[in-house]
Amino acid sequence: MPNSFGKLFTVTTWGESHGASVGVVVDGCPPNLPLSVEEIQTELDRRRPGQSDIVTPRKEEDRVEILSGLFEGKTTGTPLTMMVRNADQRPEAYAEMREKFRPSHADYTYQAKFGIRDHRGGGRSSARETIGRVAAGAIAQKILRLAGGIEIRAFVTQIQDICVPALTAFPSREEVEATPIRCPHAATAAAMIERIKAVRSQGDSVGGVIECRVRGVPAGLGEPVFDRLEADLGKAMLSLPATKGFEIGSGFAGTRLKGSEHNDPFVMRDGRVTTTTNHSGGVQGGISNGAEIVFRVAFKPTATILQPQQTVDVHGADTELAARGRHDPCVLPRAVPIVEAMTALVLVDHWMRQSAQCGTFKF
């Protein structure tokens, strides 16, 4: 099912950018989990448009409505349905895109696959689809906190050629949220913001890298072959709009090391097995080893830009397109909570699978 994710904690998203609403159905949520609308809304507010001058100015409150699966402040164990109504729609800004394909966008490939597409804001390919992921991820993050004290933190480490210095400490939520770019290094964040503003003034866009760290994951989560933990994390991240790369631990840089340099030596600390280094990124053989999980996701520059570009129309003629509408000059600030949400969805699903198979890590 191409619109669903997860095996036991299953998430199905629905809706389009300029349709009536977008939302999600969560199947497999444990019963009796205390849950409020406010907990979901807090995460949605972090991804909503219009929150700063370096993101799209589209004004959406993104107020979530829980339609089913919640009774007297607790989950019932039945499908939990959440919906957000679309409000600030301007389909006239996309009129030209009915006939012309945006370069590097999903316009052409959706047309090639389905023979029909909703050209208004990209329809189903719009990042508004991720509202459902963030709503579901808020629930998954709460389960992980209650079950094992697992903490997930994503943050921007690179915008174009501007990179943060190596960070050794696990950043706090306050450090990440201190600036609109969601980079925990203040000086680098300021340079990133200036770059985005400069590029936006030129009608252009930029990409970058988000790093995600997870602490508190016990050893044993994941599967040994096709459903390796890093494979599922990679699939989750690469399913996000605008992603073009994923690496975990040492990633591609690890290819420059020798085995004697890359191996993570085991030691006993406080009665448990741990490692002195973490080139593996917290996963070995597809299974978590108890160390901090560390991975990075590459996001391309936003495809929809205001500069004239060479393209083709639906009749097969060469033409030119200068996009209109309201678009992010850089998707990374709003992608941070989405990366955290998808991480939580992967981990809670593997947590439940491990509990079902081995009777451990119970909620």
From Swiss-Prot:
EC number assigned by the record:
4.2.3.5
- In which pathway is this protein known to take part? Metabolic intermediate biosynthesis; chorismate biosynthesis; chorismate from D-erythrose 4-phosphate and phosphoenolpyruvate: step 7/7
Please list the residues that bind NADP(+). R47
Q: Copy out the cofactor comment.
A: Reduced FMN (FMNH(2)).
GO annotation, biological process: amino acid biosynthetic process; aromatic amino acid family biosynthetic process; chorismate biosynthetic process
Q: What class of enzyme is it?
A: lyase
**Function of the protein:** This reaction introduces a second double bond into the aromatic ring system.
| Protein known as | Chorismate synthase
Which organism does this record belong to?
Answer: Opitutus terrae (strain DSM 11246 / JCM 15787 / PB90-1)
Gene name as annotated = aroC
